[in-house]
């Protein structure tokens, strides 16, 4: 037990063994009696420090340890290694069951009924006046645990019962440890280790890696005990409680349940050193029993005493969506054991199920080779990852995926459901192909050893555990990137910092691919599995680094805080240096990717984004070049009604004045309207058709009347001149930078080119305040374009140049959003319905920002 100036308490959020160091804590019994605990010592010092007084049971424990060592030596000498292994394996199983089953049952009853405490009270074991044999023995036993001048009668029964319980725990734990270590020692290939310990070969690497794991395990145990002291080490809160504030520290900041998780990494280190798969299987058995003890003994007690995790108490976003939204059900999630949330009324769930069945049946019938299946798995992973990353990136920047469904008449919830289906389907296909690939390698190729396969399965188990913890913490909403699609549903703009996220900010980057690397071990370091694991890890890292992290900053306004692992690491100088190095490499990588790989803005992109001025200035220089080529300068092609900004608003009529020498004029001359980016660099010949956007300059031409928009025509002794108009019947209805070209006779030879100008839709963004105003503005615009009938319908046949795409672009220009042409057709081009839908989409997208 820790001293009164440095006590410990379990974390009251349901997380087991999250103990903390605190300044002052006064224990209290179940009867609320508060007391200052005496000083206690850890197990090793209590047993082996000769300066400390020993109790009778402690002497017995020491004797049993020595006896087991002697037994091991003589059994090995006279009975052989195999028989000795059986003896100590049997002992280990007995003591391990005594620990996990025996102590587990005792603690279970103590937790629920205070059985040990009540037994002590009922039989007056610690009563000063009690004189029965059991009472005298108990008092004699624990009196050795008190310092001189202190008395057991000063403390409540709960404390004394706990001290006595510790003695039996020490016996079981020390025998459990001793018999396991002796079993491992007997299993060691001593000659192989001694001959290869200084060599850089598989055996030498394996041995040194195992040694490092054992040393790490020792550090975990020492650090854990320095944090939790004896109180939590010996399950003190099953007997009495302590009041204190919580401050996480040490190894409990690095990993959940460290005494049960990484606290057993030494088992696997010893398995590596021995190279014996029997030792590995025994270690796994012991570790699994420990996890069962954690699950069925400690966790229920912690939740009962301190309450469950706070995240479980709060209603998740998914539960709120199910309750508040019509036609929404929780998404299908493919797990290691099958499907979660399967809905027999959702067709997409059946698609996923049929896809899995088709892949398995197809592989059974076609029986592809391992290489073929590996190529399919690798290609599928690359394609699906690129699709997922593209959707998430565009969704984060422009709500592209949601807009796509909104434009086609669906709502944002349906869009999110479709993303859930796509993401889960991709994950399911990738994992089922990986499982089949491993199976085919196991059947058709050389499989690895028992050790590599077992360690591979352990890595797979780590990934399953990691995914389970992540899902438990962030639920379906976080699992399916809900904050990319429905950030408006987030009540608290605060990043998760509980569960596994207390220890690691992005656990999926490390443990989320552990099982993928486990397949490398299972498939005996196959090159194809190395490629798969590398690809999987790279896409995982890229997604977190360049998509998730920037989006979290955008939505939550802050980056994730330092994880427990990072805080613990930076306490040490080497940790600070290592983190500094990682940060520098990370920054260099960012600089390289964003300066070398991100393409610079092109002219076409500038055109799309509205950066018109630089393009127009460039084209004015080209215009002067054409004039110089004409030589005389007696050529003129001017736009009459252009403003100072070189802009004309659709559908204004455009008047053009022209003049050429009589020698250059031909009655079949004509003027065409072209988009600058489509005409290319050739300023002497137009190599693209005008698509009907042209007019003759003379009424005596051989052209049809539809293309004779002549306002004026005349000539004198030197020049022929006139003016024409481009009205809505031949005008372009697409925004962009345009120019007029005067062509000679019935050819595409350019005589002169007008000044470039911008053709834009009217701007109403600032003036449109509500949906009714938007409807009125849209109808007015369509009426000016001559495509509105019955005061409410858009008629596609009124103007072949004003299409559904044009109307879509109008809404995009006016409201920064639009609907699809398919949706327009479904409404029979009803302007009221279409405009109301556009307004609704705008409100939804604004709400998602």
UniProtKB/Swiss-Prot annotation:
Instruction: Quote the protein name from its UniProt record.
Output: Phosphatidylethanolamine N-methyltransferase
What this chain does, per the record?
Catalyzes the first step of the methylation pathway of phosphatidylcholine biosynthesis, the SAM-dependent methylation of phosphatidylethanolamine (PE) to phosphatidylmonomethylethanolamine (PMME).
Cleaved signal peptide residues = none
Q: Which locations, inside or outside the cell, does it occupy?
A: Endoplasmic reticulum membrane
Q: Which organism is this protein's natural source?
A: Kluyveromyces lactis (strain ATCC 8585 / CBS 2359 / DSM 70799 / NBRC 1267 / NRRL Y-1140 / WM37)
Q: Catalyzes what? A: a 1,2-diacyl-sn-glycero-3-phosphoethanolamine + S-adenosyl-L-methionine = a 1,2-diacyl-sn-glycero-3-phospho-N-methylethanolamine + S-adenosyl-L-homocysteine + H(+)
**Membrane association type:** Multi-pass membrane protein
* Entry's Gene Ontology cellular component terms: endoplasmic reticulum membrane
A family per Pfam:
PEMT
- Lumenal side residue ranges read 1-55, 107-167, 221-231, 286-350, 394-417, 473-509
